[in-house]
Amino acid sequence: MPSDRQKKIRNFSIIAHIDHGKSTLADRLIEYTGLISQREMQSQMLDNMDLERERGITIKLQTIRLVYKAKDGEEYYLNLIDTPGHVDFTYEVSRSLAACEGAVLIVDAAQGIEAQTLANVYLALEQDLEIIPVINKIDLPSARPDEIKTEIEDIIGLDASEAPLISAKEGLNIEDVLESIVKNVPSPKGDINAPLKALIFDSYYDSYKGVIAYMRVMEGQVKKGMKVKMMATNKEFEVVEVGAFSPGAIPLDSLSAGDVGYLAASIKDVRHCRVGDTITDALNPTESPLPGYRKVNPMVYCGIYPAEGEKYEDIRDALEKLQVNDAALVFEPESSAALGFGFRCGFLGLLHMEIIQERLEREFDLDLITTAPSVIYKITKTNGEELMIQNPANMPTPQEIRIMEEPIVKTTIMVPNTYVGAVMELCQDRRGEMKDMQYIDDTRVNLYYEMPLNEVIYDFFDALKSKTKGYGSLDYELLGYRASDLVKLDILINGEQIDALSFIVHESKAYSRGKGMCEKLKDEIPRHQFPIPLQAAVGNKVISRETIKALRKDVLAKCYGGDISRKKKLLEKQKEGKKRMRQVGNVEVPQKAFMSVLKLDN
């Protein structure tokens, strides 16, 4: 039987497409319940990384406890768990949804439902959550709330007749949302007297208290001084502090079934506190862990190397600290002839990669070089051995390879029908294979494509946005591997192969990518005293070449008029010298050249 206290708890999260006003609504809810005075209020209250505020996106999960006095005169505890909306962070969304009983679905009154909205709704439905649709941005002149209501009913199948119409920016009708949460979200179930069972849905590292786990207590209760055990790693810890966020950390005596809060237990290593793990009482453990958590596998890899004057150890320390907060980041040491010692890092997607790079540069003040992102390829050698390759440098020679397969993703692209042609062209250009096309309503279309992940991770998202004036949206999931004509493209500078610039590319694109890289390098590498050939090669065959001309002294300056043979002699002598120089000279490739080539779009 749920206790009286449990009846007053509502755990919910907010799901929305990027930019539909999720963090703004969270700010308004905080303001409305009087948790923070107007003076202390800042926008995107829950996005506490500078980077999140700057890009206006939510990366890490946040949680906050609101106290709301409802119209029925009762006080309710509303635990808001904020979720990221970007496609790279789908796993984080699924974790926060598992900690809730309900979800507020925000739909933009002008733009309507987008691909990411749908993807998150399906995640919420899988967890059996009560979904409350809310229509935001009704203050916009282009808002069309009634059409959006029917759209929600037609596409998702939710009853939206009573959906609150709000403007989070203007603070309109915020109370309706709170009332709707109190009324529609079920209160948590769970026996307070059962053995402790709590779900970790996020963690971060505090330099004083060690790893702090954000958790939702499902059954039992957790108190200070209790011994707890992590079920995935079987490690035991003594609880030093438990509490809730409101918005800063507020220590409490205990958290019981239904509560959302945090736990500190002097955990030194984040790997002992896996997101999605179950915490239980070490002396009286629960029988089975909570279902549904998997280890996240990186989809995109790239090399991170120290730039001039940076130390390898500093990067390792920084990566370890980031890994504390980011269970999805993996890294291992590697070395490259061109760049020295560095790390091979795995990420969930390109946005995740950019964010980690920016955090390394900002929070740890490091200067980095990153190599071109690549995915994991599956290679079957002629002797039957199977390899998984994510670094082009480890690729066997073409003679040894029997089949080479690349990861394929199933993409769902939602676009206004005026842009269908442009998007289909883009997908074909990226080697996409059309599987299906569905009209959602008279204005929008869902396109289903199977595409190589390699083509999606570069800049597909940006290209899609520019082709659709920002209205296209994308969601993708991994399907599996498929054989493909892939080749390894090497870049040779002055006849020497530069391993950091090698990458794996589809045969049809090898020439254009190789030519593009050579041209870019030609602009970036300073001229030397001898001519430098830049070549792009596949195997032993050079497919493109540029030459950086030599700097030369004007050896004829001292000859006035005079005999041609004298001039010839001087020019020949200079030519000989340059030739000798070219054999012994080595080319300095500035780091700027690496950076600009690796940022090479399309």
UniProtKB/Swiss-Prot annotation:
From the UniProt record, list the reaction(s) this protein catalyses: GTP + H2O = GDP + phosphate + H(+)
Q: Which GO terms fall under biological process for this protein?
A: positive regulation of translation
According to the record, the segments passing through the membrane are none
The UniProt record lists the tr-type G domain at 7-189
Per UniProt, subcellular location reads as: Cell membrane
Q: Name one GO molecular function term.
A: ribosome binding
Q: How does it sit in the membrane?
A: Peripheral membrane protein
Pfam families attached here? EFG_C (PF00679), GTP_EFTU (PF00009), GTP_EFTU_D2 (PF03144), LepA_C (PF06421)
Its keywords, alphabetically, are: Cell membrane, GTP-binding, Hydrolase, Membrane, Nucleotide-binding, Protein biosynthesis
Q: Where does GTP bind?
A: 19-24, 136-139
EC number(s) recorded for this UniProt protein: 3.6.5.n1
* Gene Ontology cellular-component terms listed: plasma membrane
Biological role? Required for accurate and efficient protein synthesis under certain stress conditions. May act as a fidelity factor of the translation reaction, by catalyzing a one-codon backward translocation of tRNAs on improperly translocated ribosomes. Back-translocation proceeds from a post-translocation (POST) complex to a pre-translocation (PRE) complex, thus giving elongation factor G a second chance to translocate the tRNAs correctly. Binds to ribosomes in a GTP-dependent manner.
Family recorded in the similarity comment: Belongs to the TRAFAC class translation factor GTPase superfamily. Classic translation factor GTPase family. LepA subfamily.
Protein name per the record: Elongation factor 4
